Amino acid sequence: MWNEFKKFAFKGNVVDLAVGVVIGAAFGKIVSSLVKDIITPLLGMVLGGVDFTSLHFGYGKSAVMYGNFIQTIFDFLIIAASIFMFVKVFNKLTSKKEEEKEEEIPEPTKEEVLLSEIRDLLKQQNSSKDRA
């Protein structure tokens, strides 16, 4: 049972997925900070001091903080656009590497060369028998 767990836990895909989740969480924090600390204040200056997070409505002590919701949507859109651009660049780089691999014709192995020579000799023998 322990060996099965080790095979599962240390498979390349599982480890890659775990690394992706950790990096994704850190990337999300970076983009959230970018939106909260840089983009939203700049947008506020352009639009005359608009701060989404303070927007709310309510009655008495109850309040619906729809500004936080708008801010979260804004964060999501920026994160989604950033990930889209990252994946697009990554796919472009990956496809170039695959094209380079396809262009390279591998050298035939010794066995392939030997088999080709044997095939050619057999063809010569068969063609000389047909002529005789």
Curated annotation (Swiss-Prot):
Q: Which InterPro entries does the UniProt entry name for this protein?
A: Mechanosensitive_channel_CS, MS_channel, MSC/AndL, MscL_channel
Q: Where are the transmembrane segments?
A: 14-34, 38-58, 67-87
Record the organism. Bacillus cereus (strain ATCC 10987 / NRS 248)
Please give, as recorded in its UniProt entry, the membrane topology of this protein. Multi-pass membrane protein
Instruction: Give Gene Ontology CC terms.
Output: plasma membrane
The top of its lineage is: Bacteria, Bacillati, Bacillota, Bacilli, Bacillales
- Keyword Lyase recorded: no
State the oligomer form and interacting partners: Homopentamer.
What gene is this protein translated from?
mscL
Q: Keywords for this entry?
A: Cell membrane, Ion channel, Ion transport, Membrane, Transmembrane, Transmembrane helix, Transport
Q: What is its main location?
A: membrane
Protein's job: Channel that opens in response to stretch forces in the membrane lipid bilayer. May participate in the regulation of osmotic pressure changes within the cell.
Against PANTHER family, the record matches this protein to: LARGE-CONDUCTANCE MECHANOSENSITIVE CHANNEL, MECHANOSENSITIVE CHANNEL MSCL
Q: Which family does it belong to?
A: Belongs to the MscL family.
Q: Where is this protein localized, as stated in its record?
A: Cell membrane
This one is known as Large-conductance mechanosensitive channel
HAMAP family under this entry? Answer: MscL
